Amino acid sequence: YSSAASDVYKRQLSVLASYPEFGCTGGPYEVCPDWGVFPDVLCIGNEQAMQFVEDILGELIEIFPSRYIHIGGDEAPRVRWKNCPKCQKRIAEEGLRAGGGFTAEDRLQSYCMQRAERFLNARGRSIIGWDEILNGDVAPNATVMSWQGSAGGIKAAQMGHDVIMAPNTHCYFDFYQTADTKDEPLAIGGCLPVSKVYELEPTAGLTEEQAKHVLGAQANLWTEYIATTEHVEYMPVSYTHLTLPTNSLV
């Protein structure tokens, strides 16, 4: 598949630094020079912020011909939404209620994802989201990319959603390739030897009919700890010289 990517409401500190009115607290905000998960995200109760999201998505589809737009959905803290009068008003107006193991703020995320999906579907595009978009009321036409193991992908396929398997248990190539790391360049952690990559079965746990929803698998090489091209080439080198089965990684 081909996709363009956008985090529509989290990791937005750069946006909030420029447009503090789009945040729940009003700022001031600073651009973060590092990586991580931060509490300040877009205010979903602010209609101008939601229009900003749609404007960005509109620009993306003008630039990229991709059928799919990956809009994120992972690692979005709820703390600001929980304490934000505008977000709480949106929750009340939309009838978003806690239940089924999910909070009203979880369903506020679902509202945002569904709104983005409607915007893109109306323009002939489809969304992909990380498996956290299952936490609430998943957008009805969304393709789910499962990174927290395979459980989210299995659940999504059982629900009738298309799935891309990218489990960190098998497909995160920024992990160390060996348990003996003393001579290895810095990595984020973990241990993912080639043998573990080969063990990936993207359709395990699914019926033949459910397995049809698995579009394939994706390996990720995140670069928080990878500063040079040489390091990029080193990290997956043990994998990329192998011919992996086409039913495992695509």
Residue map of PLM features:
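Aromatic- and acidic-residue-enriched carbohydrate-binding clefts of CAZyme catalytic domains
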Residues: 12-48, 80-104
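Single conserved hydrophobic/aromatic residue that forms the stacking wall/gate
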Residues: 1-5, 9, 241, 246-250
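Glycine-rich, aromatic-flanked loop segments that form ligand/cofactor-binding clefts
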Residues: 3-21, 162-164
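Substrate-binding groove of N-acetylhexosamine-processing glycoside hydrolases
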Residues: 46-68, 75, 89, 93-238, ...
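Generic structural motif recognizing short loop/turn segments at the entrances and edges of beta-strands
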Residues: 11-12, 20, 38-40, 140-142, ...
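Core alpha/beta catalytic barrel or barrel-like domain that forms the active/cofactor pocket
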Residues: 3-12, 28-35, 67-81, 127-131
